[in-house]
Amino acid sequence: MLRHNVPVRRDLDQIAADNGFDFHIIDNEIYWDESRAYRFTLRQIEEQIEKPTAELHQMCLEVVDRAVKDEEILTQLAIPPLYWDVIAESWRARDPSLYGRMDFAWCGNAPVKLLEYNADTPTSLYESAYFQWLWLEDARRSGVIPRDADQYNAIQERLISRFSELYSREPFYFCCCQDTDEDRSTVLYLQDCAEQAGQESRFIYIEELGLGVGGVLTDLDDNVIQRAFKLYPLEWMMRDDNGPLLRKRREQWVEPLWKSILSNKGLMPLLWRFFPGHPNLLASWFEGEKSQIAAGESYVRKPIYSREGGNVTIFDGQNNVVDHADGDYADEPMIYQAFQPLPRFGDSYTLIGSWIVDDEACGMGIREDNTLITKDTSRFVPHYIAG
């Protein structure tokens, strides 16, 4: 894995506008950063990214299978007891899943380490699957990278294939919250993939969803919604006043209820418990197990439910705060994880996001930040394969 500088396309702003990439600049700061690129060999991708991703995902599914049968685990995950049985039912029925993203730290000369699994509402999808590929094609044509360079990126192909498998005559609704440009772009991109797969689709904001007779979900025209993709966290749905309606299982939600086990950072101590010493895992503990942290060991404290680095704190071996990110999740239960520093290239720390669609590893995206904690403002940098 090498990073090097590359020229930015002169018409980047126009290319982004033409392709609906409305958030390549966020708050007047660069988000999509193509002034640099990461180069990987095919062997690095296959052995150090793709293979571990596939293995870790299967391990995660085993955790789900154990968790739905164990009330102690569900309690540790802070999942409300009201939903335990329907989560188990969702798993037994193998309610269909679409995608997820594993976040890795990798220094290039040791196994990747899983930091967390964003299995419910992962973003940076459009950038990884589509806009990054456009960059590759332009970079090859212009000679910025080798003409025969490739990219670890079959994400869009797998998404369209998965939507084909989920085909139904019933409209597939796609929803997110209002006033979130990134979320809206992600959802519209997924909607486009569904339409390429032959699905009839409709977009609606979460705030516009209604309730019909008997608690059925409806759109603005009072049509009953039977299937919906939501870029809206499952734990928020469970805590909502209408959350108990999830128990009726009238709608098919993507992601399904069983994903609440994987979208929870409590997954990390469970993985360590069931697969201790695995080379791609970091030692992790629940709040009641933090005494197991070795004296002098650096560690990270994370809320069970948090996003984009919110309320994550890094401590050194003397319990001094090394780095901290503010957020809205300070009141959530915490987990603790052995500290694995992200590799540093120049002034930036690098995080690899490895994508899974329909249980298959299929691509990646790279984020950079000036701090050790990756946040929603962290830059996205393209990659390619050569050699």
Task: Give the positions of each predicted feature.
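Preference for protein termini
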Residues: 1-387
